[in-house]
Design a protein with these regions (language model features):
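Conserved, well-structured core domains of diverse proteins
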Residues: 1-135
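Acidic, glycine-rich flexible loop/linker segments
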Residues: 1-23, 28, 131-134, 141-275
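An amphipathic alpha-helix/helix-turn recognition signal
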Residues: 45, 98, 177-180, 268, ...
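Generic secondary-structure signature for well-ordered alpha-helical cores
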Residues: 48, 52-62, 70-73, 77, ...
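Conserved phosphate/pyrophosphate-binding and hydrolysis machinery centered on Walker-type P-loop NTPases
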Residues: 71, 93, 119, 170, ...
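Amphipathic alpha-helical
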Residues: 109-139, 384-413
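Residues on a specific face of well-ordered alpha-helices
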Residues: 127, 183, 304-307
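Conserved alpha/beta-domain cores
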Residues: 239-533
Length: 533
């Protein structure tokens, strides 16, 4: 038996045979053509065909579909392909392959992680175009029995084109928790590991994937295999029991009800919010609209996304957090100056107040969309009342502009993310100025502990259960309640069922977690008491 450690991007257990998947990057021979007009027309037909494939594969509202469609319809990719066909008189397939390689190299040279993810978009789109131009199929066949798929890297399209019932788990070398493939694996609900050194001769070997510990067991011995088969059976039974809670309220044993909301990072997660029975969206991270692109999103693009959220949620609350860029989320086109310590630098609301044109465009989009549902707006990384003063001034300007143009909007609830020690100490004063508070425990923990949560050297020392953090949470809840304002927790700690009863006894009004954690947290609430016996 061999043991390999990776990083788990979605929990769960899988037992089965490995299918090693090797992606073939199309190598197209240089081929000159005499009829440039026909070759250009063939490229246009291929674009139309691929657009139809993307629609069927991803659906209308998928962010991946939108990004690839944007590449397909306009921008440097299409211009480069057409220019190469016309000036060098080469085949459309060769022009696509060459442009793919050049654009991918450009992205590799960038330091922004989110832009590097676009390499997958370019590669997948190019492979589809080349397949259509060559009359080939892009479907991936897994065989007769369900498998654990092992690959160097995977695109979301490759996962979607596989039969979901044939996928037990996904293990890759490249990727991250926020990579396209990891998100897609989470969406279809299968365990996923990244950062595992994959070898081709694993094909056909028996394996166990532990998505809780990030471990892959190759050729497990009988004792380990029996242990995991029993755990897998228990896990499946647990899932069936949890699904029975979908339409149940989150009420404690002593009759106290709290709200359970979902955290989502893009529009692809909207269906999961409804499927798992969340009461709404407690945190919509809006960074997905700003990362992985070449320029600022237009106001109408933002508006359409928020309108979709409002309409999908209908009467359910949906809290949109204004863009939280900086630190580990950089957008190259913004030309943010390099900082010695970006985690402590110009990020979140600080960057928004520096880039007022960007900030106002997002606020206009949010308020315009508010007419279509039950929205709220939330501001990240607040550390002073002066920031609230400036936000209120800008918001008043935005509302006045909408009124002048006769554009409908609602006076929606306003919230602040309490995620800095400064905000904790000023939580009473902040609560006096907003409608409710949300505790962002991820950043609050790292700022309180003075530890970068992504620093591997501090992994063993980083403890977000530290009593200092719990005392801060309790303080915020007490201070806000003195002002008759509700408090929600929307960081990773909200999904930690070991702390559910602790938070309930502190008096928290609601928890907001990733959709897949809604049911486990609901179960934990229903087994807890708010008052001590």
């Amino acid at each position: 038996m061999k043991i390999f450690k990776g990083s788990a991007t979605f929990s769960g257990i899988a037992v089965g045979r490995i299918l090693y998947y090797h992606r073939e990057i199309s190598q197209v021979r240089q081929c000159f053509v005499s009829n440039v007009k026909k070759e250009t027309a063939d490229f246009e037909k291929a674009r139309q065909k691929v657009a139809e494939e993307l629609q069927i594969l991803y659906g209308e509202e998928s962010q991946i579909k939108r990004r690839q469609t944007a590449l397909l319809e306009k921008g440097s990719f299409v211009r480069a392909v057409k220019s190469m066909i016309e000036t060098e008189k080469v085949s459309a397939a060769y022009a696509v392959a060459t442009t793919r390689d050049e654009l991918s190299q450009t992205f590799r040279n960038l330091e922004e992680p989110a832009v590097k993810e676009r390499i997958e978009d370019v590669r997948e789109l190019s492979e589809r175009l080349i397949a259509v131009l060559g009359g080939l199929s892009s479907t991936i066949f897994l065989g007769e029995k369900p498998v654990i798929l092992a690959a160097e890297t995977l695109s979301p399209g490759e996962i979607l084109e596989m039969e979901k019932e044939k996928l037990l788990a996904v293990v890759t070398h490249q990727g991250s928790e926020i990579s396209h493939a990891s998100i897609m694996a989470k969406t279809i609900g299968i365990p996923a590991l990244v950062d595992v050194e994959i070898e081709e001769d694993w094909d056909g070997l028996l394996a166990v994937v532990d998505g809780y510990t990030g471990t892959l067991y190759l050729n497990p011995d009988g004792e380990l295999l029996k242990k995991y088969e029993e755990r897998l059976k228990a896990e499946q039974e647990e899932k069936e029991e949890l699904l029975k809670l979908k339409n149940k309220e989150a009420v404690t044993l002593d009759g106290h009800r709290i709200s359970l909301y979902a955290n989502i990072a893009n529009l692809d997660d909207l269906n999961s919010v409804l499927f798992y029975g969340a009461e709404g969206i407690g945190l919509l991270r809006s960074e997905f609209q700003y990362l992985g692109r070449e320029n600022y999103p237009r106001e109408n693009e933002l508006f359409r996304a928020y309108k979709k959220v409002a309409e999908t949620m209908d009467k359910r609350l949906a809290v949109i957090r204004t863009v939280d860029l900086g630190a580990d989320k950089q957008a190259a086109y913004m030309d943010i100056p390099e900082e010695t310590n970006p985690i402590m630098g110009n990020r979140g609301i600080r960057l928004c107040l520096d880039r007022k044109r960007m900030f106002k465009a997002q606020l206009r989009a949010i308020y315009r969309a508010s007419a279509y549902g039950n929205l709220a707006v939330m501001y990240p990384m607040i550390s002073s009342l002066e920031e609230l003063d400036e936000i209120e001034k800008i918001t008043a300007q935005v509302k006045a502009g909408l009124r002048e143009k006769g554009i409908a909007y609602k006076d929606i609830p306003v919230s602040v993310m309490i995620e800095t020690p400064a905000a904790v100490m000023m939580s009473r004063e902040i609560a006096q100025r907003v409608d409710f508070l949300s505790l962002g425990t991820n950043d609050l923990a790292q700022y309180t502990l003075a530890m970068d949560r992504q620093n591997p050297l501090l992994k063993e020392k980083y403890n977000d259960h530290n009593p200092a953090i719990l005392k801060m949470i309790q303080m915020v809840i007490a201070e806000a309640h003195e002002e008759k304002k509700k408090v929600f927790i929307c960081g990773e700690l909200a999904a930690d069922t070991e702390l559910t009863e602790t938070f309930l006894r502190m008096g928290v009004d609601g928890l907001s977690v990733v959709p897949a954690c809604i049911l486990p947290v609901r179960k934990a609430v229903r087994k807890s008491r708010r008052e001590k016996e």
